[in-house]
Amino acid sequence: MNENTTPLHPAFLTRMKEMLGNEYPSFLSSFSAPRTYGLRINTSKITCEDFENLSPFPTRQIPWIKNGYFYDEDIRPSRCPYYQAGLYYLQEPSAMTPASRIPIEPGDRVLDLCAAPGGKATAAGAALQGQGLLVANDISTSRARALLRNLELFGIPNVFVANETPAKLTKAFPEFFDKIILDAPCSGEGMFRKEEALAKDWTPEKSLELSEIQKELILQAADMLRPGGLMLYSTCTFAPAEDEQTVSHLLENRPDMELAEMEDYEGFSHGVPEWGNGNPELTKCIRIFPHKMNGEGHFLALFRKKGQAIKESSRPHTKPDKNAFPLIEEFLNEIGLKTLCGQPFDWERVEIRGDKAYYLPPVAHNFRGITFLRNGLYLGDLKKNRFEPSQPLALAIRKDEAEAVISLSASDERITRYLKGETLNIEPEEAAHKKGWHLLCADGYPIGFGKLVNQILKNKYPAGWRV
């Protein structure tokens, strides 16, 4: 996009000139520069070193994101089998920054309050390594469905995908979470170069309207944070009303919240106290400008809730219905699966709802009354005298966890045919067993299930996932 094809609103330009001073010409020139493209490695499935050795297309490390890489505009990483295996997430480089600046650890209870389409939620889920709990919420049902798909693709088993209002979540989770991500709905000024429609629709009033929503959201989020916990607030806008002023609003209304330092980078700019309420602590906020970084515009602030965390013991799961367990156990034995996401398979976490089996997150909680799309990992369906595994289960299995595998090169045309829903011819030496359920892998990384009969792999890749 450039200034001539999509004129920027005069009020926006006037404000940016006042904000940036002598940097304004460089900022304006950035709108004529090509945008950058990035992908983030799913470190719960593959190391960055292994990805670099495997990648069939050239990449360059994003210097401020440990597991982030630039790729060229003419490359289509979503067409690569590694994408279907959930090894990476396509994300604008600056948008990777917020999740990289909140230190999520395995076992944490994490909330992503406005999570769709899943860029930050998948990053948080990967950091949890299958331990703890991730509550990923979006108020829009259609967006929550897209969020669920991305979490399934990433193989995140310990997630509760909610489709609820923040006000209702606040009542359900008072001071419950160790870490919270609030990527607030905003005017999107930082994305004008990437999405021209945002620039066309911008008005001076929109930013003020959204700032009122953000002020409400940030207070609600703070109420769900445990003492000693961390909360990351981010926007993709330059507007002080949505950035420093929203941060100031929280600090003024919640004296138990304070700003925390984040890992810095030479290209980052920082919050400006005068753009908020004058609090010098606002310099701890980070601003990303497109004329100073290889990325779009972003703002982020990290908060800590004062006080000491009191670790509560997790409540036990409800007593599982074990009538269906033999069918599931028979399948797990057939494919030789004893661990899931590096953790021993825990039968206490298996829940049967109707004819479907789920693997609940290790942190049990009473979610009654909350509208949700998924609680845990969808294992599969119970059909008469057999168990049919799900696609999310296939993607939650890590490399080398299952024994009954058929591992082909990602460049093997049979992988492409499998992803289209076709049956495959398999040589005897390529399969672990002569018949039965197998996990098809691309260079060892699971893509989906198939059933082997007479050297023919019957395709079990769901129609809704096919490419």
Question: Where in the sequence are the language-model features?
Answer:
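S-adenosyl-L-methionine
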Residues: N137-E175
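Conserved class I S-adenosyl-L-methionine
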Residues: G107-A116
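Conserved AdoMet
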Residues: Y37-M96
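Mobile active-site "lid"/loop adjacent to the S-adenosyl-L-methionine
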Residues: S142, K179-L219, C236-D243, S269, ...
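Polybasic, low-complexity RNA-engagement segments
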Residues: M1-L54, E296, K306-V467
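Conserved SAM-binding loop of SAM-dependent methyltransferases across substrates and taxa
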Residues: P117-G130
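Helix-to-beta-strand junctions that scaffold the AdoMet/dcAdoMet cofactor pocket
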Residues: L128-Q129, L225-P227
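Class I S-adenosyl-L-methionine
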Residues: F177, L230-Y233, F238-Y358
